[in-house]
């Protein structure tokens, strides 16, 4: 019987592959770290589970392999099953039903038998600990099952002939690696996803061909970099896109063996600097060889410059065409990333090159690359847009349609030509002015190109005294909105950006509005208006910055920290204009009322001082006797007035404000907030050394101010000289330093006399920063917050009163309705009672008495006397 069982088992033997160790092969890194970055895939082990019955599969140790070839295991031939013991049912001498068998060698099986074979649900355990739980079909694992290895690795899914086949999930026990997808003959085959870490940040999802990535797939690396495209032999091969999120780069194109090869596009996304005019994106479109820019290609620089020509190993080599950002073009030979011919030139084209972009590229490339600043006279020319009718070319287009409509049709062409000539003659000066004002209040930019905002434009108009022509800045905004179709909500917005061509259009429109009456009978009128504006306003006064906001770079950076909140306050207290387009505006009267509501008008900041501050930059506000409170203020005038107010009441009011705050708040919250502002401005300042000095000496200022905050009110005045003295003493006791080259040289206290003027300047700046913070945060913003809370409280009270009034009205209506119902019920009740009374009157006659006529009264009297007489007789 045992021999027959052996034969049956031998017939049912099937071969199976033992589990093999599979690693995610690392891919070769590219040679060029700039244009051809290669993400190295983390290697991991994914054992392939195989299920022999007669012999325990050899489970290879899980290890990180660096080779691309996987260790392959031959399918072992099943040995004979020799049953040493059996516990269970038998039918006609064959195992049947549930039973437990122990085989020779230590393997065991517990489960269902049929006709002497393992058939149905069961658990087979090899002597080395490998276990299979699932379905058996005639001694063969089939359909669905779970494999568990001694190290904890598991596979659960479909099984065919003892091998993983179909859909299943594998989890490695020694490493956080898992695979879920399709299998074929024990190997990953078809669609599947593999995860290389427990967090799920490193994974591959796509096509597999017998444990090899082949076809289309997405690979996400632990660093966050992502590749999406075609694969071949576990490497990027074919068309695909790689995104390096860590360096903000992207390549889309052809790959060969994990490296860029063929035609593609590589883009460098760079962080945009605030107020920068360009999107700051460098892009190369062309041919690659082994990860290098090699062959024909175009390189677009972030500033607008562009190179088109031949490349060799990431360098411009051979014939090419370089278009600089100022519009000039060099076309000729390049050698080793430089223009081939060198000579002297009057124009300094080093400013024209996008040095920032080249520096960015040099930092990323294995070998340096730069573009020379020289040119060849025969091949350098200006892009003047010969196909354009404008003398300014295609780079600058003036929108003169509405202005020319003011002139007769026959003279419009001449007016346009003459004014374009006038702009062309002054274009260099106007570009310089635009660049100067657009950079006010901005940090140093790598490409030195900024966008002008309305705030800069207002400062330009006031510096050039446009408002001296009996027109306010608010009026100018409305004029420009008519010509340019600006939305109502953005007419007076300080953050609206202005391009160079828009800046030129604004100047022409304002020139016409200011001087058109003077030259209306002369031709060319628009030319004369613009020329007079240039000669009387722009040339003499441009770039001579006045006011309190942009006068000093360091203070401007500090002041910009409060501009957003001040804009919120400004818009909150604006009122609709009485004339079209009915936009929100701020009049001087509203401004003064706002300060009064904030309780800031006192002996330090009087109404007279308020008027004097506003009139500093506007002669039409106050002439010493009469004041005009109806003048409108744009946000620049509003904000600069606040800055001036912070200087007017700089010490007395600030000290009192400090005394109103608990000492703990002074030493913690206020200092922390001020320090934050200092640190923010330090990062934005062009000189890190200067900012660092300010940060160091600010601590001494804080300690002195804290001492003031702890003093009683009566000792404040006496402590003011001590404050200044203590500040100086702190600086003597503290470590002094000065800049030498790029480093810091620490000095002894004896060197103070050499640094005294510099320290005094820093001390003034630090005190100004503290006072500025206290004025805006502790005084202005706190008062605004209090007013807003009061307004909200008033609104809440009004809503509550309205709700109560409505509720009372509803209650009164309900009460009135109830009274009406009661009245109606009472009336119905009375009517009902009346009806009952009427009905009761005829029904009072007894129904039992016969309806006979009553005897007359005389008869009744005789009857009574007759009844009484016998009694009398009896008594007698």
From Swiss-Prot:
Gene3D superfamilies: Histone H3 K4-specific methyltransferase SET7/9 N-terminal domain. Residues 39-50 have a biased composition (Low complexity). MORN repeats lie at residues 86-108, 109-129, 132-154, 155-172, 179-196, 204-225, 227-244, 251-268, 284-305, 307-328. Residues 790-832 form a coiled coil. It comes from the Eukaryota. It is found in: Cytoplasm, Cytoskeleton, Cilium axoneme; Cell projection, Cilium; Cell projection, Cilium, Flagellum. One of its GO terms (cellular component) is sperm flagellum. Residues 17-37, 356-372 have a biased composition (Polar residues). Keywords: Cell projection, Cilium, Coiled coil, Cytoplasm, Cytoskeleton, Flagellum, Repeat. Expressed in ependymal cells (at protein level). Residues 1-16, 375-386 have a biased composition (Basic and acidic residues). Residues 1-71, 356-386, 839-876 are annotated as: Disordered. May function as part of the axonemal radial spoke complex 3 (RS3). Radial spoke complexes are important for ciliary motility. PANTHER family: RADIAL SPOKE HEAD 10 HOMOLOG B-RELATED. Interacts with RSPH6A. Does not appear to be part of the axonemal radial spoke complexes 1 or 2. This is Radial spoke head 10 homolog B. The gene is Rsph10b.
